[in-house]
């Protein structure tokens, strides 16, 4: 039997549709064709297996105890996930019957692993082929089916994903337990959830918030002067130029080359007023600008965040709908901005489809010449998947939502740009010497918009307008300085992060790294997280109540700030994590050993545990006596309200949890030290149902973990996990 294993049901249906009939549907499978050429298509539902919990390796590890740390499993174990156990059983039976298996996971790191791990777990001896499907339209799927590759070619990709999975387990579970237990011994409350990627991302937000909070504006001075040609036959148009600080003024400048000393500015103005000068440099040119490449997921999220203020997860979910439900775009979780050269032959069909699905772009589609070939088509730059582009499908499955239409239009615009002419900029520069000072004026103008007619323009704060044309003067021509001025300005704090700028920071993490050598290395890597995980990382920080939104800005909660303050710098900064991502990329390319990477990580975890945690939080409660919020488990304080005294959450207004005053310890367990959820590490909260007391995750409905109650404390055995 030939068995195809897809990553998800929607992909399985697309594969079945491309295989010959008749089709027979069963529970968790689709049979295609008859006789010896028949094939069966089944699917995973994301990861069917998950890393075993600590207690699976050692029953003593179920209880959180500092003496059991660090926990390094050997050998590693996977267990079927309860929520998808039925589909796992279906797939297990099919794999055991198969004499040929085709791996059809998504064309990325996780897509490779989630099918590979099932095959390894079941110990199949059948040969395994691999197909890469970036486009769910029938012709594209059929093309992929006809071009299978040996799955062994993708072993390094699978090793990279497996190393990432194990690194997350080692780092997250060990350090979360270590820092939680360390602070609880000091009377602190709550669970200190530490993640290999999420913690440095939170650190970026906390550092930005702290910078803004402690920012002290300082005055700085810009010296400008108006110049005009002295000779009557020369171009007499006046122009404004800015002073260029020389090396002798470095002591009066800040790190951004701004003048901080007003007396120096006044001295310059006095020295040049009415004085003759000379053109030192006159440069004018027309500069072509090629179109930007098609979009990767991060580029799409950044653009959509900037233009439409869409959150990273919203963009990903919308793109996933366009891919799976409507089949209007190619695989959305791509980190590539290049296209395979063979795809160039489909350009006319894609452009016709864009004109149908996005009527607002039909005029551009009609004018687009299809002979131009931008730098995007380059096989050498394409790996498992290519840039996100529209498919040849001309109609959606039903009406597109407003968000879906915006994302489709955005992807289409960047595709159409590949056939548009270069934009042409006219640039000019005049450098003037007057006395011992130098001034410079610049000119910028778009004289032929080219691909920019497809660009959605949105003026960014602080963006300077196009500069007026300069007079056409030549080197050594005399000029006269008139109306020199000193303009006082104030330094401005940076803005709080938005979805777009935080994603940009994660993809360009080298900007936030202090070490010069490390920064140079990181410029070659993808930064923190991957295309497929960045939105989920940000979402996790919101769900764990480390971040909150203030209009379009992302801010850190007090809980998030406390966590970062409590951790060593090497855990809360991006340096080490970004290096790990670079190492994982090396594993993917077959250049790094995943075992060496994990051994190095174990050494680092031992090093963290050898250091005493910093005192990040002030203990204001007597251990064991504090009342904690039933919603977020933060400490509560007594407040006076309209109807008398009550307990209120100290995190108000971010959390509006309250509880009445009681003469005894509350039955819901909020007077006890928080116990972490075994699934997501959020605090457990005691709740009452018709059958009696139980403990549920405070992160409900994001996490539905429940634990039995045993004499007012969470029991060891789990009652339910989904």
Regions found by a protein language model. Name each.
Residues 251-293, 575:
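Metal- or metallocofactor-binding catalytic centers and their adjacent structured scaffolds
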Residues 140-225, 285:
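C-terminal or mid-to-C-terminal helical accessory/interaction module adjacent to the motor/catalytic core
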Residues 27-57, 199-248, 416-468, 600, ...:
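Structured, non-catalytic alpha/beta "coupling" segments that mediate domain-domain communication
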């Amino acid at each position: 039997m030939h068995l195809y294993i897809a990553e998800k049901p929607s992909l399985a249906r697309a594969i079945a549709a491309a295989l010959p009939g008749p089709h027979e549907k069963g529970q968790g499978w689709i049979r295609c064709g008859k006789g010896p050429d028949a094939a069966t298509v089944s699917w995973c539902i994301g990861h069917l297996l998950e890393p075993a919990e600590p207690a699976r390796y050692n029953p003593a590890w179920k209880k959180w105890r500092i003496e059991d740390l660090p926990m390094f499993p050997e050998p590693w174990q996977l267990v079927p996930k309860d929520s998808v156990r039925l589909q796992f059983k279906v797939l297990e039976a099919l794999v055991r019957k198969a004499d040929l298996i085709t791996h059809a996971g998504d064309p990325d790191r996780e897509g490779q692993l989630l099918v590979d791990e099932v095959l390894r777990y079941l110990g199949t001896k059948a040969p395994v082929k691999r197909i890469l499907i970036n486009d769910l339209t029938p012709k594209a799927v059929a093309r992929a089916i006809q071009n299978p590759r040996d799955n062994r070619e993708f072993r390094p990709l699978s090793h990279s994903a497996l190393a990432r999975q194990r690194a997350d387990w080692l780092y997250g579970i060990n350090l979360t337990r270590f820092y939680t237990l360390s602070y609880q011994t000091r009377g602190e409350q709550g669970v200190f959830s530490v993640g290999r990627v999420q913690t440095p991302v939170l650190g970026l937000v906390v550092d930005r918030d702290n910078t803004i909070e402690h920012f002290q504006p300082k005055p700085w001075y810009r010296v400008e002067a108006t110049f005009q040609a002295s000779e009557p036959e020369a171009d007499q148009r006046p122009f404004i130029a800015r002073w260029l600080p020389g090396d002798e003024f470095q002591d009066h400048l800040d790190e951004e080359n701004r003048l901080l000393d007003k007396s120096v500015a006044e001295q310059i103005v006095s020295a040049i007023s009415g004085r003759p000068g000379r053109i030192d440099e006159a440069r004018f040119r027309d500069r072509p600008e090629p179109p930007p490449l098609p979009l990767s997921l991060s580029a799409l999220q950044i653009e959509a965040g900037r233009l439409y203020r869409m959150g990273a997860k919203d963009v990903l979910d919308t793109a996933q709908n366009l891919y799976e439900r409507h089949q209007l775009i190619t695989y959305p979780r791509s980190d590539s901005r290049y296209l395979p050269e063979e795809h160039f032959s489909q350009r006319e069909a894609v452009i016709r489809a864009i004109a149908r699905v996005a009527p607002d772009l039909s005029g551009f589609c009609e004018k687009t010449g299809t002979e131009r070939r931008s730098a995007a088509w380059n096989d050498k730059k394409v790996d498992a998947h290519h840039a996100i582009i529209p498919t040849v499908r001309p109609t959606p499955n039903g009406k597109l939502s407003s968000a879906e239409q915006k994302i489709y239009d955005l992807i289409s615009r960047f595709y159409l740009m590949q056939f548009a002419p270069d934009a042409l900029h006219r640039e000019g520069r005049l450098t003037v010497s007057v006395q011992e000072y130098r001034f410079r004026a610049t000119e910028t103008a778009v004289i032929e918009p080219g691909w920019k007619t497809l660009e959605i323009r949105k003026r960014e704060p602080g963006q300077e307008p196009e500069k007026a044309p300069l007079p056409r003067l030549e080197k050594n021509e005399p000029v006269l300085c008139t109306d020199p001025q000193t303009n006082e300005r104030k330094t401005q704090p940076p803005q709080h992060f938005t979805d777009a700028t935080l994603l940009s920071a994660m993809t360009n993490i080298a900007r936030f790294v202090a070490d010069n050598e490390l920064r140079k290395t990181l410029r070659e890597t993808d930064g923190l997280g991957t295309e497929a995980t960045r939105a989920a990382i940000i979402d996790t920080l919101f769900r764990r109540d480390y971040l909150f939104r203030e209009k379009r800005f992302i801010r850190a909660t007090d809980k998030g700030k406390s966590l970062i303050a409590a951790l060593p710098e090497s855990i809360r900064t991006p340096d080490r994590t970004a290096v790990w991502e670079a190492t994982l990329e090396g594993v993917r390319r077959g250049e790094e050993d995943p075992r060496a990477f994990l051994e190095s990580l174990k050494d680092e975890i031992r090093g963290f545990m050898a250091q005493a945690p910093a005192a990040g939080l002030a203990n204001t409660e007597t251990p064991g006596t504090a009342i904690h919020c039933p919603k977020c488990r933060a400490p509560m304080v007594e407040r006076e309200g309209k109807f008398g005294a009550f307990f209120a959450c100290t995190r108000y207004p971010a959390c509006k949890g309250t509880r009445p005053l009681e003469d005894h310890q509350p039955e819901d367990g909020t007077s006890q030290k928080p116990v972490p959820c075994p699934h997501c590490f959020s605090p457990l909260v005691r709740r009452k149902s018709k059958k009696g007391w139980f403990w549920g995750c405070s992160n409900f409905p994001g996490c539905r973990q429940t634990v039995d109650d045993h004499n007012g404390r969470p029991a060891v055995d789990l009652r339910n996990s989904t």
